[in-house]
Amino acid sequence: MERELRLGIMGGTFDPIHYGHLVTAEAVRDEFKLDKVIFVPAGNPPHKVKRKVTDKKHRYLMTILATITNPFFEVSSIEIDREGYTYTIDTIKEFKKMYGEKTLFYFITGADAVLEILTWKNADELLRLCYFVAATRPGIEGNKIDQELDKIRKLYGDVIYKVTVPSLAISSTDIRERVAKGRPIKYLLPEPVERYIQKYKLYKEDDSR
Ligand code: ATP
Ligand code: MG
């Protein structure tokens, strides 16, 4: 009998996408033997209202450039095509419709995002619709993640797993600040993405205010 499809969903603002995202997605794919990982650039992320997020077309194209060499990676425009704020619950429901009820979904998040899951829209429904994978991330204490995982497991059962991924202390915020200050971003993200940033003169203005 064929086994059910297992899909990883890697959500993010990807402003810009970097090696921290890619190494995390690949490590989780391997650990859970996922058939593929779908990167989903956020359209209008509700938690990032404090700063101007780069045009979604740029973020989508950079995500494509970064993932193109991995046969297991795909990019979905599901969230950037949606008007208004985008919520994970709506995205997962749409994927369920597309792939069928039997497909297992693993939503991949870094440790910082894990600490916020319970505040997400319809968190209880979401935790029943898909598994969550909490990837370690430099700067976020292991203990803190374990505590949060315990809390979630007590409420919802075995729906969340922790995966240790090769530590890369890279963030999009740091990359944007580097570009604004004229400092190098080489080796932090794939070269085509670096070229794209230069070509369209992204992040030239310091937006860290
Ligand atoms: P920003 O600094 O703008 O918040 P970011 O680097 O955190 O950007 P996001 O697009 O916010 O990137 O992250 C998408 C997902 O990837 C989140 O779940 C985040 O925790 C995870 N992630 C980002 N960078 C890393 C990293 N270096 N290691 C592990 N996980 C990461
Ligand atoms: Mg972030």
UniProtKB/Swiss-Prot annotation:
Pathway annotation: Cofactor biosynthesis; NAD(+) biosynthesis; deamido-NAD(+) from nicotinate D-ribonucleotide: step 1/1
Pfam family, one: CTP_transf_like
CDD domains registered for this protein in UniProt: NMNAT
Segment forming the signal sequence: none
Keywords: ATP-binding, NAD, Nucleotide-binding, Nucleotidyltransferase, Pyridine nucleotide biosynthesis, Transferase
Enzymatic reactions: nicotinate beta-D-ribonucleotide + ATP + H(+) = deamido-NAD(+) + diphosphate
Recorded coiled-coil stretches: none
GO molecular function per UniProt: ATP binding; nicotinate-nucleotide adenylyltransferase activity
EC annotation from Swiss-Prot or TrEMBL: 2.7.7.18
Biological function: Catalyzes the reversible adenylation of nicotinate mononucleotide (NaMN) to nicotinic acid adenine dinucleotide (NaAD).
NCBIfam families: cyt_tran_rel, nicotinate (nicotinamide) nucleotide adenylyltransferase, PRK00071.1-3
Family note: Belongs to the NadD family.
Full protein name: Probable nicotinate-nucleotide adenylyltransferase
Lineage of the organism: Bacteria, Bacillati, Bacillota, Clostridia, Thermoanaerobacterales
